[in-house]
């Protein structure tokens, strides 16, 4: 810009119209502070790198130092440039101050112009010509002074504004690192998913073949853990023994339970502490068993003619009718099945279990009475069927072989399941007896109802 063509009003007005040197001084202080901070940071970085490279050596340490060193150098260089910029700003502020001081103040220029106007207005006769020339001369000096100040300021400011350009910081990371990291992450995720699928497949395959490969897996594990090549063989042998013993647990348990139950019942039934005493049988209980006989007799007496044959004269052994001497030879205590097969309907409620034995004295009295009552019921069977009852046929005498008979009865008591039962009528009785004489064992013959009721020999033994 050609400041010489501009009047002092403009040049002086511009210099006085601006903010002054304050902003330039503030910029210089800011640049100076930035330079100080950059220099301190660079020193800290350099110290840290020196410490790391001293205690950490290797390729990674060298790579780190190589990546950080350019950045430290850049910070140091930038600090120097910032300090230079601060100095330039300070120089620019100084140039402004010098130009401002050299510039004619605008009020002085305005006063000169006002004086010139007055002189020119009062110069009627030419008397103000010298004063006017002097005022013009002072104005010209003002013009030259402002032009010189502006030219000097322009030169100084142009030098002060010439600052070395700043460089961008060097990269400390690989620009392709993000892309490479993304590719690596994708590959890792894919590999992890593949490994998970493979692991699931292996687990499922192992579970599917766990039953078949159990021995092989356990054998390998035993050999690997113990270090003994024959450990698996010992393990399999012990496992086989364990399985064999476990298979015998249930049968042995059932056998022991059955045996113990039988022993307990035997002890309760054949309790030697409280033997059976027929004298202790209550008369009321005996009457309860005989009640059925009296009821039947009373009922028959009102609706039927008198019975022409003797009844209830035979004894009872279990469910069989025998001679009276047989019943006397029978032991006092009998099996539960034999006792209850001869009881009547009224004897069952009277049989109560008492402390000390399976059947108390009262219960035995009840079933004994039922046996007698049962004889009455069997004696009237022929009459109720519409026929008549004749005299009982005695094929065996009371005095026939009492010892042998006792032995047969005792055998029946010990093994009631060995008795073979046969059912026939009067017409087939002789043939059945003839056939049974050829068969060994103990036989019980049961007579079916007919024209007459006959108690046949129900026990036979051969061999």
Swiss-Prot record:
Native organism: Mycobacterium tuberculosis (strain CDC 1551 / Oshkosh)
Family membership noted in the UniProt record: Belongs to the mycobacterial PPE family.
Gene3D superfamilies attached to this UniProt entry: PPE superfamily
UniProt xrefs under Pfam families: PPE (PF00823), PPE-SVP (PF12484)
Biological processes annotated in GO: response to host immune response
Annotated InterPro entries: PPE_C, PPE_dom, PPE_sf
Domain of life, per lineage: Bacteria
PANTHER family, A to Z: GLUTAMINE-RICH PROTEIN 2 (PTHR46766:SF1)
Name of the protein in its database record: Uncharacterized PPE family protein PPE30
């Amino acid at each position: 810009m050609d400041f010489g063509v501009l009047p002092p009003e403009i040049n002086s007005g511009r210099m006085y119209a601006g903010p002054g040197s304050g902003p330039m001084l503030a910029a210089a202080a800011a640049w100076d502070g930035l330079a100080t901070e950059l220099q301190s940071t660079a020193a800290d970085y350099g110290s840290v790198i020196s410490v790391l490279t001293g205690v950490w050596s290797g390729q990674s340490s060298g790579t780190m130092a190589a990546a950080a060193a350019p950045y430290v150098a850049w910070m140091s260089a930038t600090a120097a440039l910032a300090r230079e910029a601060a100095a330039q700003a300070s120089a620019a502020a100084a140039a402004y101050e010098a130009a401002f001081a050299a510039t004619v103040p605008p009020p002085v220029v305005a006063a000169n112009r006002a004086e010139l106007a007055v002189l020119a207005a009062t110069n009627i006769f030419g008397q103000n010509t010298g004063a006017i020339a002097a005022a013009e001369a002072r104005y010209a000096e003002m013009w030259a002074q402002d032009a010189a100040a502006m030219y000097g300021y322009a030169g100084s400011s142009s030098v002060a504004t010439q600052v070395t350009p700043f460089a961008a910081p060097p990269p400390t990371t690989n620009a392709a690192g993000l892309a490479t990291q993304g590719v690596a992450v994708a590959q890792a995720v894919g590999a992890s998913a593949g490994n998970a699928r493979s692991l699931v497949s292996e687990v499922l395959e192992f579970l599917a073949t766990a039953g078949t490969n159990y021995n092989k897996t356990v054998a390998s594990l035993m050999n690997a853990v113990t270090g003994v090549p024959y450990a698996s063989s010992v393990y399999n042998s012990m496992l086989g023994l364990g399985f064999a013993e476990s298979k015998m647990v249930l049968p042995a348990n059932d056998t022991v339970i059955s045996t113990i139950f039988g022993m307990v019942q035997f002890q309760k039934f054949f309790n030697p502490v409280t033997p059976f005493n027929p004298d202790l049988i209550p008369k009321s209980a005996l009457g309860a068993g005989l009640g059925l006989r009296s009821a039947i007799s009373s009922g028959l007496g009102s609706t039927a003619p008198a019975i022409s044959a003797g009844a209830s004269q035979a004894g009872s052994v279990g469910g069989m009718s025998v001679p009276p001497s047989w019943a006397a030879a029978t032991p006092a205590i009998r099996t539960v099945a034999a006792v209850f097969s001869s009881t009547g309907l009224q004897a069952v409620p009277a049989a109560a279990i008492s402390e000390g034995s399976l059947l108390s004295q009262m219960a035995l009295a009840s079933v004994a009475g039922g046996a007698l009552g049962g004889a009455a019921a069997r004696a009237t069977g022929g009459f109720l069927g519409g026929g008549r009852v004749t005299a009982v046929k005695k094929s065996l005498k009371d005095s026939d072989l009492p010892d042998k008979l006792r032995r047969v009865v005792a055998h029946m008591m010990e093994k009631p399941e060995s008795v073979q039962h046969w059912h026939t009528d009067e017409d087939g009785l002789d043939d059945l007896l003839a056939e049974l004489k050829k068969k060994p064992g103990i036989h019980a013959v049961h007579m079916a109802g007919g024209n007459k009721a006959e108690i046949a020999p129900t026990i036979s033994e051969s061999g």
